[in-house]
Amino acid sequence: MAKESGISLKEIQVLARQWKVGPEKRVPAMPGSPVEVKIQSRSSPPTMPPLPPINPGGPRPVSFTPTALSNGINHSPPTLNGAPSPPQRFSNGPASSTSSALTNQQLPATCGARQLSKLKRFLTTLQQFGNDISPEIGEKVRTLVLALVNSTVTIEEFHCKLQEATNFPLRPFVIPFLKANLPLLQRELLHCARAAKQTPSQYLAQHEHLLLNTSIASPADSSELLMEVHGNGKRPSPERREENSFDRDTIAPEPPAKRVCTISPAPRHSPALTVPLMNPGGQFHPTPPPLQHYTLEDIATSHLYREPNKMLEHREVRDRHHSLGLNGGYQDELVDHRLTEREWADEWKHLDHALNCIMEMVEKTRRSMAVLRRCQESDREELNYWKRRYNENTELRKTGTELVSRQHSPGSADSLSNDSQREFNSRPGTGYVPVEFWKKTEEAVNKVKIQAMSEVQKAVAEAEQKAFEVIATERARMEQTIADVKRQAAEDAFLVINEQEESTENCWNCGRKASETCSGCNIARYCGSFCQHKDWERHHRLCGQNLHGQSPHGQGRPLLPVGRGSSARSADCSVPSPALDKTSATTSRSSTPASVTAIDTNGL
């Protein structure tokens, strides 16, 4: 039987051995590696009938051209590594015994594929954003993107130049995202370039559309990557949609499958399908399991499948998204807006922080309002207190003035009693209060008023008495001070006179040695005529008094000139001694009552 089919027994044993131990012992190479291509070509003879691949985890042949479908329409453009998104007619053929192992091995590749897909969408969005501004800026952005992928510029330089070109800064998460995922894209580019026997720059120049392909899916909104791009911050509806012709396909329609990332050549299998699909002839069915049952978001939300209810709800939401496809064709890749556990934790943390801040603000506002309310209450109480005090003082002042005016007026007692009686009688509601009560109240008020007035009068009398006493004491003090000053002046005058008596030979004007004597009184002595004329204003009073006190025969005697011999004649013309009062002694220093009295006594 083996010979009839063209396969020897030895080849069957080799195939069986590779089928059993292939996935466990083979060291997986990088996706798109030429080594995997060689292993694939060696392990699958061209004369074999359509069997499943020997290594379920093995790669597909690397191809950089679109795969032509049976209906003649090229569909599903290849991604960066050239592996196209396969139609559902091609078989992956997983074995039931290795489904769980395959799932565990595919997780890293799936995560890397997801990150590479995000990076491609990001670069495509940047290029489209530049084109939306202007074609020149779009060309600059495209050049920067190619330079970044070719490692000719660093991420920081790319950030700065992109900001200079577009005048829009990138969001803070973009640089860490590029640092984390750009090496994966460069590694894929290197593998593809090696497979094509080209340098990475040559390969990227020839296959630029694979990196910046806008027809794969609607790129992310540029407002998510650039700051302050759109005013409303809403995501625009995707405008680029692919048209397909699967509705005209002759094969029976299958459930619409979500487009999967095909950068990594490793196939995807659903963990729910553990038994391979086989036809009645014993061969594997060419139809693969539905790819939408286990996609990238299933890995991020694998914790949801631990509970059946959440799993069913999640699958219903996912099927509702898949039902939006066009007649069983491939649908554009839907952007997954669901958050991971870490993102949910960050969101909850931010929300909790915001709520705590709001609570703190509310608490502070409440405390401030309570403090303001207490301050208003205290201010109101203090204002009411001072109002009462002011009203009481005003009433007392009015009553005091009225009592004073009535006491000074005639018939004040009668008028006071009449006014008070009239006031109490005119009050409303007096019929409800006994008359005796009003009388007692009136008497008490009158007593208080009289007592207050008596106290005021006593206070006024005491103040006046104190004022009079102060005035009397001040007057006595002033009189004593004036008397002391007068006595001191008299003593000073007597001292001056005594000094002049002791120095009779000195000039009465300048104090020098005198050589002449006044011819009128023969008492005053001067050093010359100049000092005599100078002192005449003060001396003529004494000299005139002496002349009036002389005898009549001596009144007509002319004034002799002052000379040295006049002292001899002074004995003949003795001057009488008039009675000098106190005022003449204190007017000037020229008045010498002591010397005059001495001369008079000698003459008598």
Swiss-Prot record:
Annotated region (Interaction with PRDM14) at 107-215
Q: Where is the composition biased (Polar residues)?
A: 64-79, 88-105, 402-419
Q: Which residues carry this modification: Phosphoserine?
A: 33, 264, 409, 577
Q: Where is this cross-link: Glycyl lysine isopeptide (Lys-Gly) (interchain with G-Cter in SUMO2)?
A: 38, 449
Output compositional bias ranges, type Pro residues.
46-59
Lineage, top-rank taxon, reads: Eukaryota
Annotated compartments: Nucleus
Provide ranges: composition bias, Low complexity: 583-598
Point out the coiled-coil segments of this chain. 451-491
Q: InterPro entries of this UniProt entry?
A: CBFA2T1/2/3, MTGR1, NHR2, TAFH/NHR1_dom_sf, TAFH_NHR1, Znf_MYND
- What's in the GO CC field? nucleoplasm; nucleus
* Start and end residues of each TAFH domain: 113-208
Molecular function via GO: transcription corepressor activity; zinc ion binding
Q: Which Pfam families match?
A: NHR2, TAFH, zf-MYND
Q: Which disease is it linked to?
A: A chromosomal aberration involving CBFA2T2 is found in childhood precursor B-cell acute lymphoblastic leukemia (pre-B ALL). Translocation t(9;20)(p13;q11) with PAX5.
Tell me which PANTHER family the record gives.
MTG8 ETO EIGHT TWENTY ONE PROTEIN (PTHR10379), PROTEIN CBFA2T2 (PTHR10379:SF13)
Question: Quaternary form?
Answer: Homooligomer. Homotetramerization is mediated by nervy homology region 2. Can interact with RUNX1T1/CBFA2T1 and CBFA2T3/MTG16; heterotetramerization between members of the CBFA2T family is proposed. Forms a heterooligomer with the AML1-MTG8/ETO fusion protein. Interacts with PRDM14. Interacts with RBPJ, GFI1, TCF4. Interacts with TAL1 and CBFA2T3/MTG16; the heteromer with CBFA2T3/MTG16 may function in repression of TAL1.
Listed name of the protein? Protein CBFA2T2
Name of the coding gene: CBFA2T2
